[in-house]
Amino acid sequence: MSPALLFCILIAYFALLLGVAWATSRNANNDSFFIGNKSSNWMLVAFGMVGTTLSGATFISVPGAVGIDAFGYGQVLIGYVFGYIAVVYLLLPLYYRLKLTSIYTYLDGRLGRRAYQSGAGFFILSRLFGATARLYLVVAVLQGIILDSLGVPFWLTTFVILGMILLYTYQGGVKTIVWTDTLQTTCMLGGLFACVYFMLGQLDLSIPQALQQMHERGLSRVFTFDPDSPNFWLKQIVAGAFIVLTMTGMDQEMMQKTISVKTLKDSQKNLLALTAVLVVVLSSFLFLGGLLYLYAPVAGVTATGDKIFSTVVMGHLPAAVQIIFLIALISALFPSADGAITALTSTFCIDILGIQRRQDMTEEAKGRLRRHVHLGFALLFLVMVLFFKWVDNPSMIGVILKLASYTYGPLLGLFAFGMMTTRSLNDRLVPVVTIGAPILCALLEYNQHYLLGNYRLGLELLMVNGALVFIGLYAISRRATIKPAVVTA
């Protein structure tokens, strides 16, 4: 299909997004931007969060990783279920009881200002790396299938896409994103199931026959039983639970949408519904990956990893499937980037600049400052995407989860210490602990050959990081003379 036609489809899709944004952002204010005026429909939030949770990294990398790890990602998926249950029944009641706009305000009331700012700072770092890595992956695919042939440079593609995101989130924030993410999730899931349907047709297989062939070729293996392997089943399941606990339950972007729902009960239904949908969708992505690796030898495709999906679709499937793939790919791109920029803006304004505590600023001045911060993060996203272009790792899902182990570990330690103890901290030393723990983890990972023998660290590095922060916080704490105002839910 002509790159020019595909480009026109891209523009038409964005025009639709702008229409939705215009309709939902009228009469928006700062509360609309930060928490959607606390009036978001839980079903819309749950459905839209599927797109945010999955992102372009899932769309491209999870099917691509089947060639290396088979269905091993299913171990992490099992852990996700336990993690969501923990968020629903441990963290959400706490956030609603305290009526939080930023979830890191909890750390301020319980542990102190430095702990509060450390938590917000690590969230900013986490989302900045994670969201830009996801954005890079999808931009790179779009560049390869459309824009290289039109002579458009990579940096300009990224700049224009970020400009598009700014246009439809600049005013409405969360109030707009709840609706645009719903539209984009619909397109992404439609693309996923359409690709599965067409791949089965190309291979002339039913679902049971396809699974049988995957089994014969070793593509359907889920569990790894070698305890020294980074993919050992118990490590992966436990790590999956902690990934959700931190990357959803302690993540302002994900919780910002969740706590925009009016009541705790509806918010809990939102996350439980999200969990059920994610199990089906991620299993479908693994199945699609198996189909791609069954089809590749037949079609003479040599691409692997993150490149196999786009190579098969754009080079070997009908034009209709190519259009569906493009729309689904764009739909996977925007939710992970728009929500991240909005959440980073919220966290920086509320937690770092203290915009809601500023009595000396008018509502208009606060809105102007918030828009400047929003623009600043968009420019920072551009720089980070160009950095990942320079790195050019062949499997970005691994990079994203590895980065999460380092940046979400301090959040895990801070929240765990606040909820599991009643001790008070030496607030000045908190940054030393939260920065020191990831450095120790990096040294441990680099020297694991000498320190751990045949054992290889995997995603459990997140738990090690969190445990080091917890131990460090305990070391700089003392028994509280009065009961803390905020401890647990």
Language-model segments: residues:
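Membrane-embedded helix-loop-helix hairpins and adjacent transmembrane boundary segments
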Residues: 1-489
